[in-house]
Design a protein with these regions (language model features):
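N-terminal secretory signal peptides that target proteins for export/translocation
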Residues: 1-8
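Bacterial N-terminal signal peptides
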Residues: 11-20
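Generic short N-terminal amphipathic or hydrophobic helices
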Residues: 5, 15, 70, 191, ...
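C-terminal helix/turn sub-motif of individual leucine-rich repeats
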Residues: 128-131, 150-152, 162, 173, ...
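Concave beta-strand-loop units of leucine-rich repeat
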Residues: 115-120, 137-143, 151-153, 160-166, ...
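N-terminal capping/linker segments that flank leucine-rich repeat
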Residues: 24-142, 154, 163, 176, ...
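Canonical leucine-rich repeat
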Residues: 113, 125, 136, 144-147, ...
């Protein structure tokens, strides 16, 4: 009788164990966060980059707003965020182990995202479809030679692209809604093809590798900062532009006569450390 009781108890434990395992199988413990359905994460609908956790700092912060987002942290964990703007300081994730992690972010509903590799090294950035994106900030990312904003975020209004060690090509000519353009500290970026940007009022493009720029397709420009483009010697402006400030110090201009002719409303000019033999008369 006692033996039968022991066998019965063991049988019950086996049943409980299998029931528990079945329940775990039905619940994907890799996925955590808010409760909503999301599409399969593909190259077409995600932002993708590599995180290199090499030191004691293992925390990655991503600021976003405007819609739902899903992040595959690259270690088997997927986080769903209904409202990322409600998270103070952004979405924060801390990696447990050192290593390389391939991160994917579903961002089709987002209107703003800020990704930076300043504290944790990021590389190999690729963009996916972001039709609602209005404000895009990408900083301190290596091993990325080109970015195509035309295809993936054509409705963007503000861009902040900085400190890309290897960026050579940036496509923004079809982003017609651009108002603010900040592209800086990209030493290998030698040219930008500006399309028609009728609403762009500010251009901050310092510390790049430009030798020549044409801004004729930006008629609404008010403020221009092209400082510290060490080989920049030629600049074309729209004659109908009411520019109030131009900063071109630390460039290679030999003359700024043509620039000044296009700026009858100019209030601020900084042109030190160029190759000017004498200051052109205004």
């Amino acid at each position: 009788m006692k033996r039968q009781s022991i066998l019965f108890v063991r049988s019950m434990w086996v049943v409980i164990l299998f029931t528990t395992l079945a329940a775990c199988k039905d619940t994907d413990n890799r996925v955590f966060g808010d409760d909503f359905e999301f599409p399969a994460l593909t190259d077409e609908n995600t932002i993708r980059f590599t995180v290199n956790v090499v030191g004691d700092w293992r925390q990655l912060d991503i600021v976003a707003s405007g819609g739902r987002m899903v992040i595959d942290w690259g270690n088997g964990r997927i986080q769903k965020i209904e409202d990322p703007s409600s998270m103070s300081g952004g979405v924060v994730y801390r990696y447990g182990n050192k290593g390389l992690y391939e991160v994917r972010i579903w961002a089709e509903e987002l209107q703003l995202i800020d990704i930076s590799g300043l504290l944790l090294p990021l590389s190999h950035l690729y963009l996916g479809n972001m039709p609602r994106m209005k404000s895009l900030a990408l900083n301190s990312i290596s091993d990325t030679r080109e970015l195509d904003l035309n295809t993936f975020c054509p409705n963007v209004e503000s861009i902040n692209i900085g400190s890309f060690a290897d960026l050579e090509h940036l496509e923004i000519e079809d982003c017609f809604r651009l108002r603010s353009i900040q592209v800086y500290s990209n030493p290998k970026l030698t040219s930008i093809e500006f399309g028609s940007h009728p609403e762009a009022e500010s251009l901050y493009c310092s510390y790049n590798g430009f030798s020549s720029l044409s801004l004729k397709s930006l008629p609404a420009l008010r403020d221009i900062d092209l400082s510290s483009n060490e080989v920049l010697s030629h600049l074309e402006l729209n004659e109908k532009t009411s520019i109030s400030a131009i900063l071109i110090q630390g460039c290679a201009f030999q003359s700024i006569t043509d620039i000044l002719k296009c700026c009858p409303s100019l209030r601020e000019l900084s042109c030190s450390y160029n190759k000017l033999t004498e200051l052109d008369q205004i």
